[in-house]
């Protein structure tokens, strides 16, 4: 099978994304970095961020070498795994790490330049920050599609399988590089989350509550570590998370498409089904770039106007992609192109609804957060209670939206043939529709990730302006940019969680295809079904596999798997919350020590030891991230070896359902506490320094690990467990107790 000409649109779009990202980076570097003091502060943050990243990558490299050797043994020693897996695993991790490095480098160079641009105008500051954030967005989608293109070309050339099984083998092999991306994302999210919140909690508790000094005050020893943490967690961490979702959704959908049309007379349609998600992602890149250029605002713009400025770019790109999808699938000539286009639209709309719901429950422009701020009048306890309650209620809309998106995407893909909804062919097409809905949701990632990466850049710009002593007009502009960044960051977290849920569901369906390959690898060509009939493994449907492995709710191994999966979300959150607590204790003690021992800090005559706080956060994050991160790799392997395929299916379902709901709750509760504090700081309920303010600072401090460590890391937990299960499918088939 030759590679069709239309495929080359995919690597071409990847190259365009990287070229535009490079142009934005060069444009940002040409901006003036400001006064000597602004440059000095930016250099402190830059050195701290890069020191952390170097240390993290050293640890991750050791883990990758060990896992790659293990996969090499399974492939070449035990013979239970595809021989390409070790190499695919390494490239997935490499490209994910590369995206994080470029994003972090850009963000740390952009903050002072954004603050300096804000000295000219609000619009100038917005453009510098947003286009610097766009570097992260475009690098993620560019490197993601480049990696996918590379592996498709290599495997198409070297996989020596004929007939419809060739594309099945190619797509299931490509899917395994997602584990490399997932593993790298796991360490980036968990380590970055622990780092940033240890610094943030330490800076807030001692600086704001005990010493009574403002946020980002240069007298606070933890303030540089806090600024470094914004980049570590919200740029490198978020980028790795969404890189994993982006690649995972495209690859899982391609694998489902290859399986749905794996018949001798359907090979042409099979190729179209594999190419469709790649082409939608490729066109999405180009249209996202157009949206990025549309973002601008006027001087003195209100928060609603600033949000509208970003919304113009995102919504315009979404509308263009929605229209382009119909054209792509029609010209491709794929079966039921109209229904599949509607599945893509379903994903796009679901992403927008989840983003809007997140904004409603976390922005102080709306009642839920206003009520939390009002509850501060009776102390910190009521702030905590109100935030927990609001976070729990906020799960309803995202869960119902994802549920509606799943059923609509499924029905659109099968042409609303509800009478035969569970027929084998319709089930394959329906699952393909769900996968392509996930691709639709992530097709705007080039610009949606730009709005998210913009947040920490604007936050650091505000910190730089505060520490550099810039005038009140500049601080007013950077505060406006920072407030916008807080809202986009919260919305971005909701988007990341929703996309993770749809991607994990597509990966769950793809797991069955890996089981098929695992059976064939182990020389099993026939399934003896419980009803007394037999079916060739190559031709078996998903329903045949469900019956063969007895994946029903009456099977105790499935139930055990569901309980373990549900428990994993809470166990993981507990471990990461405690990790932040321990690291924050070290930071609090260090800041107190410096206030006590270094004379003149609070009067501005002494200089804090910023480097010591950066070092404490770095060491704490590296030490604390190992166990939670490795847990997500070890548990799926152990469940597979003990309870087999049925147990793993239960594990993935339990982890997906509990992880999704818990992630929404934690992200929204944390975001609401943060913005309730900001509302009080704007002068409501007594303003800064009041008892209400101190109560909201406590709420914000509790919410920090909720929204920036445990909550976002659950996205990767549910995807990584799926990816590990997929990669280890051959071992699970060959060796299990039950």
Where is each model-derived feature located?
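Hydrophobic packing and interface segments
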Residues: 1-738
């Amino acid at each position: 099978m030759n590679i069709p000409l239309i495929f080359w649109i995919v690597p071409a779009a990847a190259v365009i994304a990287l070229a535009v990202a490079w142009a934005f980076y060069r444009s940002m570097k040409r901006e003036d970095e400001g006064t000597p003091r602004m440059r000095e502060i930016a250099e402190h943050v830059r050195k701290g961020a890069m020191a952390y990243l170097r240390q993290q990558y050293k640890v991750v490299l050791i883990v990758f070498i060990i896992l790659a050797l293990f996969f090499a043994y399974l492939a070449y020693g035990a013979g239970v795994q595809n021989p390409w897996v070790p190499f695919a695993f390494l490239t997935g991790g490499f490209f994910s790490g590369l995206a994080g490095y470029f994003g972090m480098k850009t963000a740390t160079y952009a903050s002072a330049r954004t603050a300096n641009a804000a000295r000219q105008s609000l619009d100038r500051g917005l453009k510098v920050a947003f286009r610097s954030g766009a570097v992260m967005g475009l690098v993620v989608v560019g490197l993601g599609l480049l990696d996918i293109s590379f592996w498709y070309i290599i495997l198409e050339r070297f996989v020596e399988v004929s007939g419809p099984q060739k594309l099945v083998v190619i797509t299931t092999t490509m899917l395994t590089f997602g584990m490399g991306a997932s593993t790298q994302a796991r360490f980036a999210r968990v380590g970055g989350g622990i780092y940033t919140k240890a610094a943030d909690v330490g800076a807030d508790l001692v600086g704001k509550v005990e010493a009574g000094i403002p946020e980002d005050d240069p007298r606070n020893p933890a303030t540089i570590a806090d600024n470094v943490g914004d980049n570590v967690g919200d740029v490198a961490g978020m980028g790795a998370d969404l890189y994993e979702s982006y690649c995972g959704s495209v690859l899982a959908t391609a694998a489902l498409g290859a399986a749905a049309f794996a018949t001798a007379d359907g090979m042409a349609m099979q190729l179209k089904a594999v190419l469709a998600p790649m082409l939608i992602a490729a066109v999405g890149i180009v249209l996202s770039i157009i949206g990025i250029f549309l973002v601008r605002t006027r001087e003195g713009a209100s928060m609603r106007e600033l949000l509208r400025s970003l919304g113009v770019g995102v919504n315009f790109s979404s509308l263009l992609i929605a229209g382009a999808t119909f054209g792509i699938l029609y010209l491709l000539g794929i079966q039921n192109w109209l229904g599949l286009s509607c599945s893509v639209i379903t994903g796009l709309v679901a992403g927008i609804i989840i983003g809007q719901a997140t904004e409603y429950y976390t922005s102080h422009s709306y009642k839920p957060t206003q009520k939390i701020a009002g509850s501060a009048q009776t102390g910190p306890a009521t702030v905590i209670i109100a935030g927990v309650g609001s976070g729990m209620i906020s799960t309803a809309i995202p869960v119902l939206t994802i549920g509606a998106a799943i059923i609509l995407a499924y029905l659109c893909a099968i042409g609303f043939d509800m009478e035969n909804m569970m027929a084998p062919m319709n089930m394959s097409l329906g699952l393909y529709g769900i996968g392509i809905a996930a691709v639709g949701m992530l097709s705007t990632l080039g610009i949606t990730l730009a709005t998210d990466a913009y947040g920490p850049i604007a936050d650091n710009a505000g910190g730089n302006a505060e520490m550099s002593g810039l005038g009140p007009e500049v601080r007013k502009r950077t505060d406006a940019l920072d407030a916008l960044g807080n809202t986009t960051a919260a919305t971005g977290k909701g988007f990341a969680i929703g996309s993770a849920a749809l991607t994990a569901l597509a990966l769950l369906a793809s797991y069955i295809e890996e089981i098929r390959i695992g059976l064939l690898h182990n020389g099993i060509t026939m399934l003896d079904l419980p009803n007394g009939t037999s079916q060739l493994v190559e031709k078996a449907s998903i329903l045949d596999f469900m019956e063969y492995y007895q994946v029903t709710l009456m099977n105790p191994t499935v139930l055990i798997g569901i309980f373990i999966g549900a428990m994993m979300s809470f166990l993981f959150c507990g471990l990461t919350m405690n990790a932040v607590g321990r690291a924050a204790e070290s930071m609090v003690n260090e800041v107190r020590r410096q206030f006590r021992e270094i004379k003149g800090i609070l009067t501005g005559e002494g200089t804090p030891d910023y480097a010591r706080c950066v070092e404490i956060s770095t060491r704490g994050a590296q030490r604390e991230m190992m166990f939670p991160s490795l847990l997500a790799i070890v548990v799926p392997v152990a469940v597979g070896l003990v309870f087999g395929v049925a147990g793993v299916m239960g594990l993935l379902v339990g982890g997906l359902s509990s992880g999704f709901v818990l992630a929404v709750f934690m992200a929204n509760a944390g975001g609401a506490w943060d913005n309730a504090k900001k509302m009080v700081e704007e002068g409501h309920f007594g303003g800064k320094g009041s008892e209400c303010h101190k109560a909201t600072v406590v709420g914000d401090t509790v919410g920090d690990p909720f929204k920036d460590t445990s909550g976002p890391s659950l996205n990767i937990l549910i995807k990584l467990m799926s990816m590990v299960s997929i990669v280890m499918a051959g071992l699970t088939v060959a060796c299990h107790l039950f």
